[in-house]
Amino acid sequence: MELELLFQNVVNSSAFYNNQVAVAVSGGVDSIVLLHLMTNWAKKNKLSLPIALTVNHGLRPESQKEADFVVSYAKELGAKESFILNWEKQNIKGNIQLQARKARYKLLAEWCKNNNVKYLLVAHHKDDQAETFLLRLERGSGVDGLSSMDYKSFLNGIDIFRPLLNFSRSEIEKYAKLHRLKWIEDRSNHDLKYRRTLYRNLLKASDNQEILTERICLTALHMKRAAKALMHYTRLAFNDCVNVHDLGYIEIKLSEFYQLPEEIALRLLLYSIMAIASKHYKPRYSSLIAIFNRILQKDSNVNCTLSGCKIRKYGENILIIRESSRIQEITVNLPLNEPTQWDNRFSCTILGNQGCSVIIAPLKKTQKVPEFLKDYNCCPEVFYSLPTVQKDSKVLAYPDVNYNGKNTNDDKVQCIINSTIKQNLVSLISI
């Protein structure tokens, strides 16, 4: 069949040859077809069979039953193994579908990372792309939001592939019926309270759904090209305007910032905030643009917060500093055999053989800032966003910009830090 041949051409050119692959399976027709295609491809090429992962969001009474169906049917289709990942919901407010989507990807990526599976396949297709475009158009999205989905993306160290992107829902359903596959019809797909259902029905009601869907996807592709061009010039602006400091903050030179086209300057501010906060989701546009417009008023005072960051004017620069109250302390046991990540901004190597439990936490305003830190010519708020090694509220070691721990006289503990903010930036602006 043509779909199967085209699918094989897609995956034959992919990087996951000879590597374990996981497939996200909701139980819907698209993900069942993806699992069937991938299993057949692996068998044909004598490769490791895919692992099926399904997320139980627990949002409907039948959720557990559907998850059990996926596990059972995945085995029947020939999956190597199958697992149910449960979403532990807490205080859900606002857009529940968006929160469920974020939770789903988080659970899938974490499972893959914890089980040394580098490649995750998801079943987005051409109709998904068109519906997403219309949804975002209604919300007033910009170039990035209206851009086509990527065949390959990256999340928390995991490569995510979408091998069905060029296939329509009708082609996928035709394949499923031909092979007599079983799947679940999600009732929410027909629930008119969801905007996606509205746009799905709108496309179906058009004179020629396939042509309209194709043209919407083509427009999304044009937007993707435009987004890549904008990102290219954003990267150049970072080289000229931004200093990523070893002390874990970002400094934007205002003299250069004011010379940039507004779209590039806005992106530079956005990705600086995301890199410090280590978030893959963008902050609310209305909040971002309010801060941006304030920065553009050259005589205005800028001192505000967004996404767990402090954005403030300091001399001739704009500083993006981590908000200390949003930093979570972590507990580690000494000695540590390898570096540990702290606040997604630092890789910390803690040296010491006391065999005790310590915490890595920022300084509190009530704790003394050592003189050697004051010698650095930076905003004092930076000091309270740095990692220190503490026990019983006593500081055992301070970090040093030169990556050598400054120790107190009575404890033999070293805190060697390496900033990971540049890596955060690279992952954000390297499309």
From Swiss-Prot:
Listed InterPro entries: Rossmann-like_a/b/a_fold (IPR014729), TilS/TtcA_N (IPR011063), tRNA_Ile_lys_synt (IPR012094), tRNA_Ile_lys_synt_N (IPR012795)
Keyword Secreted listed: no
Keywords for this protein: ATP-binding, Cytoplasm, Ligase, Nucleotide-binding, tRNA processing
Gene3D superfamilies, per database record: HUPs
GO molecular function, one term: ATP binding
Compartments where located: Cytoplasm
GO biological process: tRNA modification
Function: Ligates lysine onto the cytidine present at position 34 of the AUA codon-specific tRNA(Ile) that contains the anticodon CAU, in an ATP-dependent manner. Cytidine is converted to lysidine, thus changing the amino acid specificity of the tRNA from methionine to isoleucine.
Family statement drawn from the similarity comment of this UniProt entry: Belongs to the tRNA(Ile)-lysidine synthase family.
Protein name: tRNA(Ile)-lysidine synthase
Organism: Wolbachia pipientis wMel
